[in-house]
Design a protein with these regions (language model features):
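Catalytic loop of short-chain dehydrogenase/reductase
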Residues: 105-118, 122-123, 127, 141-179, ...
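Conserved Rossmann-fold cofactor-binding substructure of NAD(P)-dependent oxidoreductases
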Residues: 74-88
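N-terminal Rossmann NAD(P)H-binding glycine-rich loop of SDR-like oxidoreductase domains
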Residues: 29, 37-38
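Rossmann-fold cofactor-recognition segment
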Residues: 61-76
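Conserved NAD(P)H cofactor-binding loop of Rossmann-fold oxidoreductase domains
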Residues: 93-103
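C-terminal helical subdomain
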Residues: 181, 185, 204-224
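Short beta-loop-alpha junction of Rossmann-like oxidoreductase domains
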Residues: 190-200
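Hydrophobic structural elements of the Rossmann-like NAD(P)H-binding subdomain
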Residues: 93, 143-145, 183-186, 196
Length: 224
């Protein structure tokens, strides 16, 4: 995890309790985002899940009890409208990531795939912070999500590494500019979610096998 909080000597101590707070999770309907939303609700917070499409109770009965709002991270007007609709809140967690598009070695990739991922991951995070922060209550926080590839590049993931590094730089900059709002980035390890569905099955299986052989826990992480 990279912590980029800007120290403020005069800032009051922030409460760690989520009881009675409102937590907005962008990308909160699946994967790590849904795990965050579930944990926030269990801790007594109102959890707002933001995603491109609203789901009916018939489609997603597991979303009962969560507030939903439509937000497309690639569309700044959509992001602005979503936060205007949400109103004041306490904590923002941005976990959303776009589909990678074309996956493979750098020399086999094209600019459209790289642009799509950078727009979704980096500029989407930028837009959420830009239009969400005016609605944050005092003592609020912004948390971004990246991954180990920000500092440990792998073949075939040039766009991901570049976008993750950009988000971490954004986090450091905002920690200074938005202080005393706390801004941090979390780098989770390998979490077995649908995020990896874009990979061919043999590559996914290879990743899981490597995790089981090399990680201390001998297993992949789970969102919860």
């Amino acid at each position: 995890m990279t912590s980029t909080t800007h120290p403020q000597a005069a800032a009051p101590a922030a409460s760690t309790s989520l009881a009675g707070k409102t937590v907005v999770v962008v990308g909160g309907k699946s994967g790590i985002g849904f795990g965050v939303a579930q944990a926030a609700r269990a801790a007594g917070a109102t959890a707002v899940v933001a995603s491109r499409r609203l789901s009916s109770p018939q489609e997603r009965p597991d979303l009962a009890g969560f507030q939903q709002v439509s937000l497309d991270i690639r569309d700044e007007s959509s992001v602005r409208a979503a936060f205007d609709a949400i109103g004041v809140f306490d904590h923002l967690v941005v976990t959303a990531a776009p589909d990678l598009g074309t996956w493979g070695a750098f020399m086999d990739a094209d600019m459209s795939g790289a642009r799509s991922y950078m727009e979704g991951k980096y500029l989407g995070s930028w837009a959420c912070a830009r239009h969400g922060s005016p609605h944050l209550n005092a003592g609020g926080t912004i948390t971004f999500l990246t991954g180990g590839m920000a500092v440990r590049p792998k073949v075939g993931f040039t766009a991901v590494t570049s976008a993750f590094a950009a988000v971490e730089a954004l986090s450091g900059s905002l920690a200074i500019e938005l202080a005393p709002t706390r801004v941090n980035t979390i780098r989770p390890g390998f979490i077995d979610t649908d995020m990896w569905a874009f990979l061919p099955a043999e590559h996914r299986d290879g990743l899981r096998k490597k995790v089981e052989e090399t990680f201390p826990a001998r297993r992949a992480g789970k969102p919860e």
